[in-house]
Amino acid sequence: MKTYLQSALNRTNFSFQTGTKVLRVRRDGGVATGVDVQTNGASSSHSICIKKGGMVISSAGALLSPQLLMWSGIGEAETLKNLSKNGHVTVPSQEWINNTAVGNGVFDNPNTFIELYSDEIASYSYSYSNPPPSDVELYLNNRSGPYTFASQTSAFWDYIEQGDDVVGCQGTIDSAGAMDLLENGTITLNVYGTSGLRSVGRVNLDARGIALPNSNFYSDPRDAAAIATFVHNIFQALPHTLTPLNIAKNSTLEQISTWLTTPSAYTRGNVQHWSSSCRMESCVDANTKVIGMQNLFVIDASIVPPLTTNPVMGVMIAAERAVERILALGK
């Protein structure tokens, strides 16, 4: 908002419109000719056409970009058939681009909350609606105090080797407890599985044609084993003054793995870091052009594989490179 958008707003050939929902890409075979949009919540839609030689780029995200492609007649054949029955796909069936890779492999980081307690710790809970006056004064007058940073005060990573494979894991520390473990002296260790995980899902559409992701956590038991190893290694390094509250510090690898995969308020959580649902070489090519199309591109988290760290920066880097490659196509 402060960088890319501000630069774009200064361009004479840029138009910015809010309250707009793109339903589908209009196309003539493999050529995108425009988009159908709804504005300001209207039930009806209208079309916006592009000039000859123009392009359409979807940056709707790892859930809605696959939905947009499916509504445009690009995706798994059975899904397109169902969408067509409901009037969502308007492209004739002979022009459908059947590609099961659209929406496949969607990924989110499985998230685990481990509550740690020490009587040497003073927890700090952030309240942006009613912060302590002394902390407000510190921030407003001196740009100091706890509100100069987020509640997650540290982050760390490790790689777990499994034969020839390597699985990435991330840990962060939050300044207070979570769920029903909120006693002063409690902090939260968040554990995420990241790159190299094998358990992925698919972006499916409900009866209304709306994207509903399936994270499919721990469908491959090796993923639970990798994250359990990460947790076990952390427990071995904890000082004697720091005690896990919702799982025993002396738990075995097998016990940790079972706990991780058992649904609870502290395990199997989504962090909404959705990615990887329109992957390169199967859904888009190296220029992020949708396979089977001449001028339709996808630039967002759906083209990025699972990353070791928070995916935001990785998505930005991939997007900048994608723009360079797309611009080069027109030269």
Task: Name every feature range the model reports, one short phrase each.
Residues 30-32, 101, 107-111, 117-118, ...:
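Short, solvent-exposed loop/turn segments at the edges of secondary structure
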Residues 12-15, 31, 52-55, 293-296:
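Loop/turn elements at helix/coil->beta-strand transitions in domains of secreted/extracellular proteins
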Residues 10-13, 82, 98, 142, ...:
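N-linked glycosylation sites
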Residues 16, 34, 56-59, 70, ...:
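Structural recognition of the beta-strand scaffold that forms the well-ordered cores
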Residues 1-32:
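Conserved redox-cofactor binding core of oxidoreductases
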Residues 25, 36-144:
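Glycine-rich loop(s) and the adjacent beta-strand/alpha-helix scaffold that form part
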Residues 144-331:
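FAD-dependent oxidoreductase catalytic-site/capping-region signature
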